[in-house]
Amino acid sequence: MAIYSKVYETSTEHSAKYIGSGELEVLSTPSLVGFLENAACLLAKEKIQNDLLTTVGAKMAIDHLKASKIGNSITVIITEVTNQGRKYDFQLEAFVDKELIAKASHTRVCVNKETFLEKL
């Protein structure tokens, strides 16, 4: 069951050839990871509801199951989110139409924006 979903439109800059992760004009894994992470980031922001805080990506595991054409719409669905203290764990799926193209797990950590940047 979907807790959250977002649709992403693919274009040439999302291709493996353009990114440099492959030679073909298909959706690149790095671009797909970006879509998955963006969906998790947006849902985390809704859950936190504090302008002083944000989340940062800490871990991503993905199974890119099927290639997809550039121009296809990618629907990212978050099926589960758990929260322990500052840590948020997401289970995500990506689809082209109704066909599953990827499954992933992603961890984000809640941080104070100012404190986080001061430590860099």
Predicted regions and their residues:
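Catalytic strand-loop segment that frames the active site of acyl-thioester-processing enzymes
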Residues: 1-28, 43
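Short beta-strand edge segments in extracellular beta-sheet folds
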Residues: 9-11, 95, 107-111
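Conserved N-terminal beta-strand and adjoining loop/helix that marks the start
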Residues: 30-33, 38-39
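Hydrophobic beta-strand-centered segment that forms part of the acyl-chain substrate-binding groove
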Residues: 42-75
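Hydrophobic beta-sheet segments that form the core/acyl-binding groove
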Residues: 62-97
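C-terminal output/interaction extensions
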Residues: 109-120
